């Protein structure tokens, strides 16, 4: 009797392991669509101003997705201490000579198409001052965004293929020096003012 009970329990445990393994395997067997580039081309061809505005209402700007990876591709992350530290080389790029300098990164997100998008990142939080340690409390650097059309993975897997839907990504194009806005009375905002992105 004891041996039979042990044998029965062994069968139950093995069955559970096989079942769980099958569930795990079925959960990961999902691949990218083979026509993803074609889907994107069709989306770009059919996009209009009205549906762009519709997508914009549900899009978010600023911040980085938890699974998004960035690689520095041009420039450096060092914020100049004063305008004297900014290059005057005529061959230099505008974003190296601005009072809100920025660098370029390759943003990679596996659940988006195109998966790699080149974006700007601000080097400084405040505008570069004329003199050393002369940062003003009246100005700051803010990102400048431009909406770009993308396809975003929905999370659904149909017949082993990931599903994508039209979306809009707020691409950071650069940084600009702006005067800080004053908090509205009763808004509860701090002295830094609005953090809304600046559209291009």
Curated annotation (Swiss-Prot):
A GO molecular function held by the record: cytokine activity
Entry-linked SUPFAM superfamilies: Cystine-knot cytokines
Paired cysteines (S-S): 122-175, 127-177
Protein name according to UniProt: Interleukin 17-like protein
Domain of life: Eukaryota
Reported tissue expression: Expressed in several tissues including hemocytes, gills, mantle, adductor muscle, labial palps, digestive glands and heart with highest levels in gills and lowest levels in adductor muscle and heart.
Pfam families, per database record: IL17
Any single GO CC term annotated in Swiss-Prot or TrEMBL for this entry: extracellular region
Signal peptide: 1-26
Organism name: Magallana gigas (Pacific oyster)
Protein location: Secreted
Residues bearing carbohydrate: 46, 192
Keywords: Disulfide bond, Glycoprotein, Secreted, Signal
Protein family per UniProt: Belongs to the IL-17 family.
Induction cue: By bacterial injection. Levels increase strongly by 6 hours and slowly decline through 24 and 48 hours.
Gene3D superfamilies: Cystine-knot cytokines
């Amino acid at each position: 009797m004891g041996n039979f009970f042990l044998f029965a329990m062994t069968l139950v445990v093995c069955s559970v392991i096989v079942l769980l393994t099958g569930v795990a395997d079925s959960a990961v067997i999902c691949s990218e669509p083979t026509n993803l580039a074609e889907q994107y081309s069709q989306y770009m061809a059919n996009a209009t101003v009205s549906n762009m505005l519709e997508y914009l209402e549900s899009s978010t700007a600023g911040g980085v997705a938890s699974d998004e990876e960035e690689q520095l591709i041009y420039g450096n992350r060092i914020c100049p201490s004063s305008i004297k530290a900014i290059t005057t080389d005529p061959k230099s790029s505008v974003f190296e000579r601005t009072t809100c300098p920025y660098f370029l990164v390759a943003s990679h997100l596996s659940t988006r198409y195109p998966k790699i998008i080149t974006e700007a990142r601000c080097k400084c939080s405040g505008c570069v001052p004329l003199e050393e340690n002369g940062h003003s409390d009246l100005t700051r650097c803010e990102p400048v965004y431009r909406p770009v059309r993308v396809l975003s993975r929905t999370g659904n897997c149909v017949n082993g293929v990931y599903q994508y839907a039209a979306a809009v990504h707020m691409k950071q194009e650069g940084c600009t020096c702006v005067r800080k806005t004053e908090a509205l009375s009763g808004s509860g905002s701090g002295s830094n003012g609005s953090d809304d992105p600046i559209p291009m």
